[in-house]
Amino acid sequence: MNSAYTAIESDVPEQAQQPSAQSNATSAGANVSPSEWTWSQKLKESSHPIALLFYIFFRVSPLFIYLFGTLLIGIITKKNKFILHFIIIVLLVSGDFWNLKNIAGRLLVGLRWWNEVSVIKSTNGEFENVWVFETVDPNRYINPIDSKVFWTLLYVQPAAWVVLGFLALLKFEFLYLLLIIISISLSLTNAMAFTKCDKFGKANHLATDIFSRATGNLFSRLNPFST
């Protein structure tokens, strides 16, 4: 399996990329550290509050519905509770996968990935999977609140599904175990892909920076007019 890498142009104007210290101090209070902010204050400091809210919703709601969905559905109807419960969780897990892969990753941390199938030229019609990674310009401001929430929930959710899967196995709930396996596979796919995308982006930016510095020093030494 191969990997490709490209850069994303910033979709945030330069003037709006990095909030001023004065606005941060005003909204959070002069004597309150960021660690003591309330959730509403942290949400106000987010660069993409709507995207952050949807990200939290899709990450948490499948787990919440798995734990309490039967009770909530039982209030509405007594028929086919398991089928409705199963379908709702599948829809939420699918929505979480799509939102994380296509929207939340790009807006919150400037990362995006997808998988392509290409034909190997040296073989007779054989195919290979290629992971394509995109990352934003390193000069773009990444909000620390958005980044912290993104990476925390990216790894916490699959860990929670693993715990629930172990409990389902102990209870011999094999249909729910099948649902959990699907959820874990989708969640781990995103976690692995974004981790690789982040590493590829950092390595590419580091290599570009080293190359630009090396060529800059070389040209400055060869320049007869340099002092």
Swiss-Prot record:
GO terms for cellular component: Golgi membrane. It is a multi-pass membrane protein. InterPro entries: TVP23-like. Pfam families: DUF846. It is found in: Golgi apparatus membrane. It comes from the Eukaryota. Glycans are attached at residue 24. The chain crosses the membrane at residues 56-76, 83-103, 149-168, 172-194. Its main location: Golgi. Disulfide bonds: none annotated. Keywords: Glycoprotein, Golgi apparatus, Membrane, Transmembrane, Transmembrane helix. Residues 8-32 are annotated as: Disordered. One of its GO terms (biological process) is protein secretion. Residues 15-32 have a biased composition (Polar residues). Golgi membrane protein involved in vesicular trafficking. Belongs to the TVP23 family. PANTHER family: GOLGI APPARATUS MEMBRANE PROTEIN TVP23. This is Golgi apparatus membrane protein TVP23. It comes from Debaryomyces hansenii (strain ATCC 36239 / CBS 767 / BCRC 21394 / JCM 1990 / NBRC 0083 / IGC 2968).
